[in-house]
A protein has these predicted regions:
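Cleavable N-terminal signal peptides of Sec/SRP-targeted secreted and luminal proteins
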Residues: 5-19
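Structural signal for beta-propeller blades
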Residues: 67-70, 110-114, 152-155, 163, ...
Length: 213
């Protein structure tokens, strides 16, 4: 006689929260050709370098001269609804996660990337850099990416604390494994990295664990 023993299967589900926290648009979205001034020159004071808009249409802007982060909510362009002060000097880029934590470049004079933790409203240093990050990004595993315009590469700070180069060689060039003044970056849910390779007039796609774009 044969006895069939039922097998038991256990499934582990890991829920990953998308970090980009940015608006989603339809494929046929169009914009009004007549623009309005959201922030005027008297407030900016110096040329702006980056801006972040989250999924709730809140707008974050790092002020280069004051080192403050200004936030606008509900399209209130007359006055910022929140100002966050920190020891920032000439910040180049900003990234805001879905829970409201803010990552800001502080590499020009202080050699680091700083994080403002929304839960307790405190600043911490999360990454050491050798030059400013012209682009910042946090992937779905909370790894931090920094595009180094002057060093011609993209560094990745893993959640375990290790930092590695994931794109570029550190030398300016146009070959498939090289970058020339990288700027904006984006990491999709497959952990593929897109780089605005500004000096080469191209967008480079680096697949996960691939150094050739």
């Amino acid at each position: 006689m044969t006895f069939l023993i039922p097998r038991k299967y256990f499934y582990l589900f890991v829920v990953l929260t998308l970090s980009y926290n940015q608006p989603r648009f339809c494929l046929n979205t169009i914009w009004n050709s007549n623009a309005m001034t959201f922030i005027n020159r008297s407030f900016l004071d110096t040329a702006p370098r980056d801006i972040f808009v989250n999924s709730n249409n809140s707008i974050y802007f790092p002020h280069r001269r004051t080192g403050e982060i200004h936030m606008w909510q509900n399209d209130n362009h007359l006055n910022s609804t929140k100002t966050i002060s920190g020891s920032l000097s000439d910040p180049y880029s900003i990234f805001v996660t879905t829970n409201g934590d803010i990552y800001v470049d502080n590499g020009q004079y202080n050699g680091r990337v700083d994080k403002w933790i929304v839960e307790n409203e405190t600043w911490i240093s999360v990454m050491n850099v050798t030059s400013p990050c012209f682009g910042l990004f946090i992937d779905i595993y909370e790894n931090l990416y920094c595009s180094m315009f002057y060093n011609h590469r993209v560094d990745k700070k893993w959640s375990n604390g290790t930092t590695t180069i994931v794109a570029g060689t550190g030398v300016q060039g146009s070959q498939s494994d090289m970058l020339n003044h990288p700027w904006g970056i984006f990491v999709d849910i497959n952990l593929d990295l897109y780089v605005a390779d500004s000096g080469n007039n191209r967008i480079q796609l680096f697949r996960l664990n691939q150094r050739n774009g």
